């Protein structure tokens, strides 16, 4: 994009933004977590870059999947980029939550579990979600996929695995990647 904007362009963009606010256009994507939405003034803002941090096994992927499903349920186009799990593994987690199943019940279903799987599949069907199938990602590839998918919400799980030539430590890699994502 252009690094400079004129005064008139800034005024025009601000006027359009205020007009959108007045007309009730969606200003935030609700996460589905009431306390988080309240803290974020209604949810995730357009152009925002948000981080979900916790120790390994802290539920980051599950929470991001629930945010994704909540947004998609409202018709928001979502691109979910996982650099650790396949779309099948992610969908299994979603089926477990939606169907009230354990992973063991999902992998070894009895007749009742099959009914829950079918019901959960139906509930999740037709949501505007796309998953990546490439395990090695760069910021440039994420940008291309975002344009291709016309996503309104992009979730990346997780930043530390994005390929980046700069930096040696995980902190340096995440910082460099975050800076590049925020600019784009």
Predicted segments, located by residue:
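Short glycine/threonine-rich loop-to-helix capping motif typified by GTGT followed
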Residues: 167-172
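Walker B catalytic acidic pair
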Residues: 158
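The Walker A/P-loop phosphate-binding site
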Residues: 2-101
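Structural motif
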Residues: 51, 153-155
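Aromatic/hydrophobic pocket-lining residues that form π-stacking "cages" and hydrophobic walls in ligand
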Residues: 67, 142, 181
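Residues immediately C-terminal
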Residues: 161
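Cytosolic-facing regulatory segments adjacent to core modules
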Residues: 38, 62, 70-150, 164
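Substrate-engagement module of ASCE P-loop NTPases
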Residues: 173-184
């Amino acid at each position: 994009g252009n690094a400079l904007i004129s005064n008139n362009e800034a005024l025009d963009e601000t006027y359009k933004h205020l007009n959108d606010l007045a007309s009730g256009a969606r200003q935030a994507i609700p996460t589905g977590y009431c306390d988080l939405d309240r803290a974020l003034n209604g949810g995730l803002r357009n152009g925002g870059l948000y981080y979900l941090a916790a120790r390994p096994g802290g539920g980051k992927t599950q929470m991001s999947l629930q945010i994704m499903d909540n947004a998609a349920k409202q018709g928001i186009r979502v691109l979910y980029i996982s650099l650790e799990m396949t779309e099948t593994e992610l969908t299994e987690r979603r089926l477990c939550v939606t169907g009230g199943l354990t992973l063991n019940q999902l992998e070894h279903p009895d007749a009742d579990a099959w009914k829950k799987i079918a019901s959960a599949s139906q509930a999740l069907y037709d949501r505007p979600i796309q998953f990546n199938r490439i395990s090695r990602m760069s910021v440039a590839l994420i940008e291309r996929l975002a344009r291709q998918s016309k996503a309104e919400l992009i979730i990346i799980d997780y930043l530390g695995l994005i390929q980046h030539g700069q930096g040696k430590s995980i902190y340096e890699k995440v910082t460099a990647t975050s800076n590049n994502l925020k600019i784009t």
